[in-house]
Amino acid sequence: MIFDVIIEIPAGSRNKYEVDHLTGEIRLDRMLFTSTRYPYDYGFVKNTLSLDGDPLDALVMLDEPTFPGCVVSCRVIGMLNMTDEAGGDDKLLCVAAGDIRKASLQDITDVPEYELSEIQHFFEVYKALEPDKSVTGGNWVDAMEAQAEIERSRERLLKTGH
């Protein structure tokens, strides 16, 4: 399964950009309150709706940061199940579909354990220090379950018309 991810936040940034889905403009939502930085490019899968009312989030393992608004054709290799103050807030872990250097990454078990721990740690603490923000959960699931969540998120969007 190949799908497009719209990048909102480049790797290494503390700025939390969000695409305004009504206007298409990219807005600076806030700067992370902690000193942590996004480990990889972060964005969302077009035409999906996750349980928190936003499009399904995706972290894209690229060797260099892109820029807000960049479209990357991706394939999913796993997903981090999480919940935040708004509800289910799962994070897809993806690679660029055409990057042969990432061809060996087909499933979550292909990613080094330490790298998964770093990513999970980021998502467990990146909202710390922010008033009225929280994050819980943090368990990895395989590519098959991640693909199923993409399909559920597409169906959810069609049902709600959101």
Where are the language model's segments positioned?
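Hydrophobic N-terminal alpha-helices or hydrophobic patches in metabolic proteins across all domains
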Residues: 1-162
